């Protein structure tokens, strides 16, 4: 029996630091340079080109470098979400230490770039159009607080969704018993369905993280 339901999220074990699982996607990326392009690779390239076009619509045609950055972030989160669904592999994106380290630096860089390059627009964005003069200080304070909590909500959303799915899988797995074949069959079938949903959640959350970060940058 598990000592704790959250023991599956422990970052270390007696064998090896589980944080090294974050490097597994790099192995697949390096191997792809020496492999003959296959149909899955062409499909992945088509998806990435579609994401690049979508990011260009949100951030402008002159944002090619920023597009590469957010798409690389999307791939990193997606790979870590996927490998975390396999048995005995640590889910790095279920920890705020990882999600915050991805969201906060990008958010700070976007904020600094905006305030340095477009100071007037940044100041105007703090006060919505048509705000009465007595409410302007309050609106400025609210806008500052809203901007400051954006990376936190972005990180918590990703980590919470990853934790919720893994907890459900763990709870279902703990209900199966070898003595009752009927109950075990139901549990296994339920886990398969839930695992398929978790793969969908992994894709959706990676896309949401990338899209919201792009929208924050475009503002």
Curated annotation (Swiss-Prot):
Entry-linked CDD domains: ATP-synt_Fo_a_6
Membrane topology: Multi-pass membrane protein
GO cellular component, one term: mitochondrial inner membrane
UniProt keyword annotations, A-Z: ATP synthesis, CF(0), Hydrogen ion transport, Ion transport, Membrane, Mitochondrion, Mitochondrion inner membrane, Transmembrane, Transmembrane helix, Transport
Gene Ontology MF terms: proton-transporting ATP synthase activity, rotational mechanism
Location relative to the cell: Mitochondrion inner membrane
Membrane-spanning intervals of the chain: 16-36, 57-79, 96-116, 122-142, 158-178, 184-204
Main location: mitochondrion
InterPro entries assigned to the protein according to its UniProt record, in alphabetical order: ATP_synth_F0_asu, ATP_synth_F0_asu_AS, ATP_synth_F0_asu_bact/mt, F0_ATP_A_sf
Domain of life: Eukaryota
Reported function: Mitochondrial membrane ATP synthase (F(1)F(0) ATP synthase or Complex V) produces ATP from ADP in the presence of a proton gradient across the membrane which is generated by electron transport complexes of the respiratory chain. F-type ATPases consist of two structural domains, F(1) - containing the extramembraneous catalytic core and F(0) - containing the membrane proton channel, linked together by a central stalk and a peripheral stalk. During catalysis, ATP synthesis in the catalytic domain of F(1) is coupled via a rotary mechanism of the central stalk subunits to proton translocation.
Assembly description: F-type ATPases have 2 components, CF(1) - the catalytic core - and CF(0) - the membrane proton channel. CF(1) has five subunits: alpha(3), beta(3), gamma(1), delta(1), epsilon(1). CF(0) has three main subunits: a, b and c.
Family classification: Belongs to the ATPase A chain family.
PANTHER family xref list: ATP SYNTHASE SUBUNIT A
NCBIfam families with a match to the protein in the record: ATP_synt_6_or_A
Record protein name field: ATP synthase subunit a
Species the sequence originates in: Artemia franciscana
Gene: ATP6
């Amino acid at each position: 029996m598990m000592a704790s339901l959250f023991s599956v999220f422990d970052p270390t074990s007696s064998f090896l630091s589980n944080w090294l699982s974050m490097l597994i996607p790099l192995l697949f990326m390096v191997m792809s340079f020496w492999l003959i392009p296959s149909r899955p690779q062409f499909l992945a390239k088509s998806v990435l080109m579609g994401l690049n076009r979508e990011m260009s619509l949100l951030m402008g045609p002159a944002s090619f470098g920023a597009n590469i950055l957010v798409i690389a972030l999307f791939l990193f989160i997606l790979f870590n979400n996927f490998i975390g669904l396999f048995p005995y592999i640590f889910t790095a994106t279920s920890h705020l230490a990882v999600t915050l380290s991805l969201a906060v630096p990008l958010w700070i860089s976007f904020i600094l770039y905006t305030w340095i390059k477009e100071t007037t627009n940044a100041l105007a964005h703090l006060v919505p159009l048509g705000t009465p003069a007595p409410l302007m200080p309050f609106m400025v304070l609210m806008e500052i607080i809203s901007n400051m909590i954006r990376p936190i909500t972005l990180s918590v959303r990703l980590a919470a969704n990853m934790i919720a799915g893994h907890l459900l899988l763990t709870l279902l797995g703990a209900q199966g018993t070898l003595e009752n074949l009927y109950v075990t069959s139901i549990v296994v079938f339920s886990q398969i369905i839930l695992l398929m949903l978790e793969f969908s959640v992994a894709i959706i959350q990676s896309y949401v993280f990338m899209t919201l970060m792009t929208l924050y940058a475009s503002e």
